[in-house]
Each structure stands twice: as C-alpha cells, then as structure tokens.
C-alpha cells in the first residue's frame, strides 16, 4: 500500500481531521440504513477494512447490536490504532493487524466497509476480486472515495498541480463493470470546518497536515501559506469547504 506511512506512524492526524467534519455521522447513518433496508439476516458478519481507531465501526456496531447478532472482523495496519479501538469496546472483535493486500483472502462477510482505503491499494483489481469473493450471498460492500468535484480534492489537485484522467472512483467503477458486478453510486456531501486556518490554531494545523501529508513542523512557511490561501478561497461564509464523496454500493445478488 502506498502513501500510508504518515498515517501509520502518526494516526492522530486523521483522527483529529475527522473530528472537523460531519462525514463520520453521515457514514454511520448510511450504513445502518442500508443494512436495515436490505434485511440481510438476523445474524450479520461485518468486515471493516482499514478500521482505524474504530470511531466509525464502534458506533455502527452499537446501533446494529440492538437488532442483530453480530460477528465483526476489523483489519488495520497500525497496531497503535487497533489498541485505541480495543480501548473503546468491552466485547469481542476479531482484529487482523496487517496490510490488507498481504492477505490471501478476506473473511466471508455479509457487509464490508471500505472507507477511504482504496487510494492506498497498489493493485485495485486484485483487491476488488478478494472483496467480491468474500461477500456472502445477498451481501453488500460499501467503498467510499472522494468525488472529483469535492473541494478537498480540488485543494489536493492544486497543491500537486496535476489532474489525473483516471480517478480512483472511475477506476473502481471500470473494474466492477468489467467484472459485471452489480453496483450503485450515491453522491454524498459533508462539510469540513477550516476556520482554524485563519489564526492557524491546532485545528488549522491539523487541516494543513492532512492536505500536505506531513507533520506541520516539517512544512515550510511558504507551503503553509499556499495551502492556507487555496483553502480560504474555496471556503464559504461559514469557513467550511464541501467534502463530496462517492458511495459505491456493491451487491452480491
């Protein structure tokens, strides 16, 4: 998996960033609603690939446990994040501390959550093949990726000064279509609070770190100023930018 070193060694960057958005609650509610609507079964095997510290997974589990019997597996490359996850729960979860691409196969599952993971996958086609092979009959997988028109994607494109013709979302859909896999795409908007970059408080530094993929103290003042100006130009009157995501729902029917 590429570009993962920063978040594996400094997991607090993503943890702090996600608290500046409302995308977490939106994702939790969407997953819960989809499982309820599809009435998968009364006993659900759930797999979260790239579970991080469990801040999303635990809330999904807590909602579903009221209605279903759950068996949960969580895959995460960072042991530090797994330990954070464990501190949140008082029930059993099967943890796999490994790079998901190193696994020959994935656990058989009724629902698989893959949120902002595929951008770190080196061989997307092989990975998606593993996902499909692990889905039980009538199972569902959700892949969450940034939409091309998301403000945060535009910020990153401006910083990198390049635009890829084949985006991650497009590549996922291309592979699924090639394999004749049934899927739907839902465009979901959330907001990122970027007000902290005005006076560059701790929240502002978190935003800079997230977009630059480096620790704040390792970023030059000129780069910080460039990122700050790009974000401020895109922000609305409430000092927020739009996080637009593609929710790619995969169905094994």
Role assignments for model-derived ranges:
Residues 1-38, 55, 59, 140-167:
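Conserved class I S-adenosyl-L-methionine
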Residues 47-48, 53-102:
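Class I SAM-dependent methyltransferase SAM/SAH-binding core
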Residues 104-112:
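A short acidic, Gly/Pro-enriched loop at the edge of an enzyme's catalytic core
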Residues 111-123:
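A short SAM/SAH-binding and catalytic strip from SAM-dependent methyltransferases
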Residues 125-140:
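A short glycine-rich, Lys/Arg-flanked "PGG" loop and its adjoining helix->strand segment in the class I
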Residues 165-180:
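Short alpha-helix
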Residues 184-253:
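Conserved Class I S-adenosyl-L-methionine
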